[in-house]
Swiss-Prot record:
Widely expressed. Expressed at high levels in the testis. It comes from the Eukaryota. The keyword Heme does not apply. The keyword Glycosyltransferase does not apply. This is Nuclear protein MDM1. GO terms for biological process: negative regulation of centriole replication; retina development in camera-type eye. Microtubule-binding protein that negatively regulates centriole duplication. Binds to and stabilizes microtubules. Residues 79-166, 394-590 are annotated as: Disordered. A motif (ST]-E-Y-X(3)-F motif 2) lies at residues 193-199. A motif (ST]-E-Y-X(3)-F motif 1) lies at residues 9-15. Belongs to the MDM1 family. A motif (ST]-E-Y-X(3)-F motif 3) lies at residues 236-242.
């Protein structure tokens, strides 16, 4: 709170020493200076004691000069001023009747004339100092013009002067401030604060007209103009660009809609010419609307109003970028809903395991099944050995289930001579219609079975005669004199077994009969491979040297010969166990004897051994190609021991020595030794483990989709 006391008392503020040329030469005495010293308060005109200092702001009146302080004597200019003698203060007595009303009227007039109008107390000392000088001058004027009681006639006409001339400007400013009107601030630099000195008053005088106190109330005079609002209409950019609802379009013919069936170009990025055209169109529409009578808006839709903003600015999902511009995609809900429903149904069927679609049916009934059944002539697996294919799970699974009683023929070299006939048969199948092809295919399976049985009976009869006569070469000659027409069938069967994996060589799904013929499929989830040997083997390389076939053939035949001698001493063999395929009807033999019937199977395969052995010993001629080795895997070439056994890659006992007996020209081949270590035989313990794993795999396959 600022300090308002600046060292000036109330007396010093109200009664200042008037300096003049007389005061310089005048040196008053002490009695003259303090002529009022020792007088009573009633003699000095003080009728009451001063009140306590209060913080409440009260109206302040300038001090009134009593009559006994007024100067009644003449003033001499050259002589010194003599203070007048104070007159005794006399109160009118109530007993005096002659002074009655006249004395009261004179007292009222004298008080009204001597009183200065009320003013508010200022807050700064500077304004108080300025106000003191003004009040002193006014008091002097009042005292000079004031006359004794007899001069009250001169005071009355002065009170009848017009208000606008006699009113004080400070009083007028106070009245306007109380009335709530705009008051122009005083331009006093001393009273301005730091904020007022830096920031000038922004309101102009025209916006806050100055009114007199008698013009506070509004009158009909033309001096004060009527208040007029701002005639300038503010138009925003939104109102200027978007005019609201578009007019209702007239119905158009279908021909017009067909002509404009192309994609509608509604892109947020407009060209430079489009705004000009848009303005011309909007101007023409405005002119048309001014002529026509504005029709009332019809409540056609109660939902979202199709405003101009919604029509021009759509979601980004409804556009696609094409040819350097964003083009609006036309809605085609029917096709989208149909596509989504088809996807949902396919997903549902895939989860439930019933996803047999028309595509699968077309694959089964199509003419291309012959291409899937018969492998390609240029198959890369043709150069792979039979024994390697017997252990290769991924590339040869059906080969172990096909009967092995017919004389073995070399597949790779036989394809070159008889490669034309399988192609002719495949072309015949392609020319047949779908139902005929399916029937013919089934008949072909039966025919193959019958011819295969015939070919199996012939070696049996020849083997019996050979045992009686002991002539091995005659049997070999009979086998070589067989017609070549049976070779394509055998080749076809072997090729089908070679490439009968889960997926065909050309890609696509194998037909259902073919998948059933394959039997149990092996995946990477199985710890062992029981159908072949239980060992986790790497896939063999597809490119083989030409001399590898003869080495595999010799090693397997030697092992079979020694095993035959041991088994024939035990007694009469048991009948063969057959695995019948429900689809193809083809009799197959279990290549891995897991039960007691292993002796019978091995004996039947051993009967065919001398024929193949003689064929191997014969010199190969350029016109006649040597036959292939039997794809059967002899027990001597199986892996012996467990997987973690240190002897896992090595054979033990007598079969091992026979297995390693090679021809003299191939005896010292490192690659052959590596290959033999990969295709090493397994023991009976491993066979039992493989059988248990196979049983678990079959049970898991049967219970995979749940029992019906």
């Amino acid at each position: 709170m600022p300090v308002r006391f600046k060292g000036l008392s109330e007396y010093q503020r109200n009664f200042l020493w008037k300096k003049s040329y007389l005061s310089e030469s005048y040196n008053p005495s002490v009695g003259q200076k303090y002529s009022w010293a020792g007088l009573r308060s009633d003699q000095l005109g003080i009728t009451k004691e001063p009140g306590f200092i209060s913080k409440r702001r009260v109206p302040y009146h300038d001090p009134q000069i009593s009559k006994y302080l007024e100067w009644n004597g003449t003033v001499r200019k050259k002589d010194t001023l003599v203070p007048p003698e104070p007159q005794a203060f006399g109160t009118p007595k109530p007993q005096e009747a002659e002074q009655g009303e006249d004395a009261n009227q004179e007292a009222v007039l004298s008080l009204e004339a001597s009183r200065v109008p009320k003013r508010t107390r200022s807050h700064s000392a500077d304004s108080r100092a300025e106000g003191v000088s003004d009040t002193v001058e006014k008091h002097q004027g009042v005292t000079r013009s004031h006359a004794p009681v007899s001069a009250d006639v001169e005071l009355r006409p002065s009170s009848k002067q017009p208000l606008s001339q006699s009113i004080d400007p400070r009083l007028d400013r106070h009245l306007r401030k109380k009335a709530g009107l705009a008051v122009v601030p005083t331009n006093n630099a001393l009273r301005n604060s730091e904020y007022q000195r830096q920031f000038v008053w922004k309101t102009s005088k025209e916006s806050a007209p100055v009114f007199a106190s008698n013009q506070v109330f509004r009158n009909k005079s033309q001096i004060i103009p009527q208040f007029q609002g701002n005639t300038f209409t503010h138009e925003t950019e939104y109102k200027r660009n978007f005019k609201g609802l578009t007019p209702v379009k007239e119905p158009k013919s279908r021909e017009y809609l067909k002509g404009n069936s192309s994609l509608e170009m509604l892109t947020p990025v407009k060209k430079a010419d489009e705004p000009l055209d848009l303005e011309v169109d909007m101007a023409s529409e405005d002119s048309d609307q001014s002529v026509k009578k504005p029709a009332s808006w019809r409540h056609q839709r109660l939902g979202k109003v199709n405003s101009e903003y919604r029509a021009k600015f759509l979601s980004p999902a409804q556009y696609f970028y094409k040819a350097g511009a964003w083009t609006r995609v036309k809605e085609n809900l029917s096709n989208q809903v149909k596509e989504l429903r088809e996807k949902a149904e396919s997903y549902r069927k895939r989860v439930q395991g019933t996803h047999f679609s028309r595509d699968h049916l077309n694959q089964i009934m199509s003419d291309s099944n012959c291409c899937w059944d018969v492998s390609s002539v240029t198959s890369s697996e043709g150069t792979v050995s039979s024994n390697i294919r017997a252990l290769d799970l991924a590339g040869d699974l059906t080969n172990h289930r096909t009967p092995q009683k017919h004389p073995p023929t070399k597949l790779e070299e036989r394809k070159v001579a008889s490669g034309e006939q399988p192609l002719k048969n495949s072309t015949r199948r392609l020319e047949m219609p779908e139902p005929a092809a399916s029937v013919r295919r089934k008949l072909a399976w039966d025919a193959e079975e019958s011819t295969k049985e015939d070919t199996q009976e012939e070696p049996r009869a020849e083997e019996d005669g050979r045992e009686e006569r002991g002539q091995d070469k005659q049997t070999c000659a009979v086998e070589l004199e067989k017609p070549d027409t049976q070779t394509p069938k055998a080749d076809r069967l072997t090729e089908g077994s070679e490439t009968s994996s889960v997926s065909s060589g050309k890609g696509g799904r194998l037909p259902t009969p073919r998948l059933r013929e394959l039997g149990i499929q092996r995946t990477h989830h199985d710890l062992t491979t029981p159908a072949v040997g239980g060992a986790v083997l790497v896939s063999p390389s597809k490119v083989k040297p030409p001399g590898l076939e003869q080495r595999r053939r010799a090693s397997s035949q030697d092992g079979l010969e020694t095993l035959k001698k041991d088994i024939t001493k035990k007694g009469k063999p048991r009948p063969m166990s057959l695995l019948t395929s429900p689809a193809a009807g083809m009799k197959t033999v279990d290549p891995l004897p897991l039960r007691e019937d292993c002796e019978a199977n091995v004996l039947r395969f051993a009967d065919t051994l001398p024929v193949s052995k003689i064929l191997d010993r014969q010199p190969s001629t350029p016109g006649q190609l040597p036959p292939c080795a039997p794809p059967y895997c002899h027990p001597s070439s199986r892996i012996q021991g467990r997987l973690r056994d240190p002897e896992f890659q090595h054979n033990m006992g007598k079969p091992r020595t026979n297995n390693l007996q090679l021809h003299p020209h191939d005896a010292f081949n490192d690659e052959d030794a590596d290959r033999l270590s990969e295709i090493s035989a397994r023991s009976a313990v491993s066979s039992l483990r493989a059988f248990q794993t196979l049983a678990r795999a079959q049970k898991r396959k049967e219970n995979f989709w749940g029992k019906p």
